[in-house]
Amino acid sequence: MSDVICGGWTKTKKADEQTQKICENVKNQVEEEPQKNYAEFHAVEYRSQVVAGINYLIKVHVGGTNYLHLMVFHKLPCNAGQEVVTGVQEHHHKDDPLVPF
């Protein structure tokens, strides 16, 4: 039997090339509101949820001991297939769990 619950979040997985690409695509959106420029912006791990598109919850290393948790919605191809940042949490650490917010 599968551990996946329809509409539920996956378990935390190690980030891959696709996750890093999503981070690169949304980096400007993340930097806009706090007007910060992150020299480092590396996806570490993520969770996902299939809805009318895909929600991603991504842990991003931004330098030193600093991490962000990002909520990103990836639209379906019929809706332009773009990624939109729907939430950012600052002041996280390496061992903080990814909890949907």
Give the location of each predicted region.
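N- and C-terminal low-complexity/disordered segments
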Residues: 1-101
